[in-house]
């Protein structure tokens, strides 16, 4: 039986952002762009599902991953219709998973987000935080700044 050469189906494989490599904070350096999830919904009146946002964004991003589908491997700037060179991005982009926040009180979850973002800042890596609700903004910005926020 021949080996399958088609891209992985969306539901197969390790679910990472755009099928990027999985990493830990200890693996990061200034060249890396880290994707990090904060699945939390403590700041909304009723549980509305914002804690599922990091997973949903990863699931959707698989359609646009470098290895997911050859037709999306070379994105085009639609305003000027020129190809965008993403060849360097694949080596830089890593997914470090979600901050474990489930079941934590709001104050403890905020501290966990702040501590994780502080560790990311110390690694000098750039980061994209995929959220839950808007309560992730203040601890993320506070940890990323060098003074009071």
Annotate the PLM regions.
Residues 2-149:
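Metal-dependent C-N hydrolase catalytic cores
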């Amino acid at each position: 039986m021949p080996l399958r050469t088609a891209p992985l189906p969306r539901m197969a494989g390790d679910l990472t952002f755009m099928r990027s490599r999985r990493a830990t904070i200890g693996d990061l350096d200034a060249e890396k762009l880290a994707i990090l999830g904060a699945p939390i919904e403590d700041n909304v009146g009723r549980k509305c599902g914002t804690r599922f946002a990091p997973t949903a964004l990863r699931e959707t991003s698989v359609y646009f991953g470098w290895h997911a589908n050859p037709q999306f491997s070379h994105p085009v700037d639609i305003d000027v219709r020129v190809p965008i060179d993403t060849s360097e991005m694949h080596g830089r982009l890593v997914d470090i998973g979600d901050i474990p926040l489930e079941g934590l009180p709001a104050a403890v979850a905020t501290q966990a987000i702040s501590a994780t973002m502080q560790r990311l800042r110390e690694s000098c890596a750039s980061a994209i935080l995929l959220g839950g609700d808007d309560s992730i903004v203040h601890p993320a910005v506070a940890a990323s700044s060098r003074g009071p926020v």
